[in-house]
């Protein structure tokens, strides 16, 4: 249609209606001015003048012009239809993109929330728990070391006390043996008994509970008359009593040592079991920390990916809006141009059907 119009306009370029003719009213001249702003309107008037001046029939001209106007209206309807289709596509695309953007924003928010409020606190908690486990392990080993040192010290004390008790018992046995073989001991034998008592006293100087027995025996041996059989029996009884006390004491410290050894062994087992549990807990905690670290890295990668996806979607939405805005501008300009041409064509059609137009054509023919 437009190609034909361009060719026709070129052909009719030299043809122009004399709008200054006295035939035309001021209203006609105003209409001419509006029509000449339109290519189609100007074309119709010039074509009509040419058609009539060459003997054409007005009704045929009207039919052709109406057909031309109808074609323009059909083309305008096509423009409306295509733009409506473009609008539907635009609305669907915008709705889709906005929904995807909303979904991505929700995913991005959830990823940030998961990272900030779950993974970070969880990682800090795991690190604190691992530190506590390491402190527990250090305390466990320190306790075991202290218990081992204390056990060694206690055992050394026990062995020393056993030696002391055995030395004292041996000295008592020697005194008893000596006292049992004499009827009237000499001064040398008494001195020997007293020497053994001094030895006993020295052996048992750390054991206050025996000091009174030793002290009494020393006093007896100093003051007693060993020739007196009654006094001698009292001395022997005292020695025997001391020996019994020493044997009981030795048995007790031996039993205490056995109990302490058992307690120590049980403590060692318990501490080692606890240490093994701590070590297993450390392995588990390290695995949890590694998993948390991996999850943090994956979540940060996801956040970066979601940011990129969101930027892409926003770019697509902006591009679609820009493209639709351009299409709308083209549509509005096209519709305005079609409306201008159709209105001008209708005005031209109305004007050429005025009797004055035919009079003008006749006047032009006479003038020719």
Swiss-Prot record:
Residue spans crossing the bilayer: none
Intracellular or extracellular location(s): Trichocyst
Predominant localisation class: other
Function recorded in the entry: Structural protein that crystallize inside the trichocyst matrix.
Family: Belongs to the TMP family.
Gene Ontology annotations for the cellular component aspect, listed alphabetically: trichocyst
Name by which UniProt lists this protein: Trichocyst matrix protein T1-F
Keywords: Coiled coil, Signal
Residues in coiled coil: 56-153, 257-354
First and last residue of the signal peptide: 1-16
Residue ranges the record assigns to the propeptide: 17-55, 190-225
């Amino acid at each position: 249609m437009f190609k034909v119009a361009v060719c026709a306009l070129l052909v009719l370029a030299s043809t122009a209606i004399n709008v200054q003719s006295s035939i035309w009213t001021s209203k006609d001249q105003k209409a001419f001015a509006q029509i000449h702003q339109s290519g189609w309107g100007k074309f119709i008037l010039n074509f009509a003048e040419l058609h009539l001046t060459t003997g054409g029939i007005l009704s045929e001209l009207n039919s052709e012009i109406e057909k031309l106007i109808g074609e323009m209206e059909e083309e305008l309807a096509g423009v409306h239809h295509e733009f409506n289709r473009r609008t539907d596509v635009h609305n669907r695309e915008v709705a889709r993109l906005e929904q995807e953007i909303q979904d991505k924003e929700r995913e991005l928010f959830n990823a940030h929330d998961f990272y900030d409020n779950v993974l970070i606190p969880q990682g800090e908690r795991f690190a604190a728990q691992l530190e506590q486990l390491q402190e527990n392990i250090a305390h466990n080993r320190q306790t075991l070391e202290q218990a081992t040192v204390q056990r060694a010290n206690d055992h050394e004390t026990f062995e020393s006390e056993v030696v002391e008790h055995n030395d004292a018992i041996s000295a008592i046995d020697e005194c008893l043996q000596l006292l049992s073989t004499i009827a009237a001991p000499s001064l040398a034998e008494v001195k020997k008994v007293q020497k053994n008592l001094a030895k006993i006293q020295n052996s048992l100087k750390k054991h206050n509970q025996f000091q009174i027995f030793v002290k009494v025996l020393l006093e007896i041996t100093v003051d007693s008359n060993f020739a007196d059989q009654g006094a001698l029996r009292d001395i022997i009884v005292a020695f025997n009593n001391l020996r019994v006390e020493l044997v009981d004491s030795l048995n007790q410290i031996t039993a205490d040592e056995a109990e302490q050894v058992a307690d120590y062994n049980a403590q060692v087992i318990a501490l080692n079991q606890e240490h093994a549990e701590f070590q297993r807990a450390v392995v588990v905690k390290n695995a949890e920390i590694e998993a948390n670290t991996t999850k943090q890295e994956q979540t940060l990668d996801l956040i970066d990916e979601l940011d990129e996806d969101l930027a892409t979607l926003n770019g697509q939405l902006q591009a679609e809006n820009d493209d639709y805005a351009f299409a709308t501008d083209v549509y509005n300009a096209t519709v305005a141009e079609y409306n201008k041409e159709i209105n001008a064509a209708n005005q031209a059609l109305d004007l050429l059907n005025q009797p004055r137009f035919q009079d003008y054509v006749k006047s032009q023919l006479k003038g020719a």
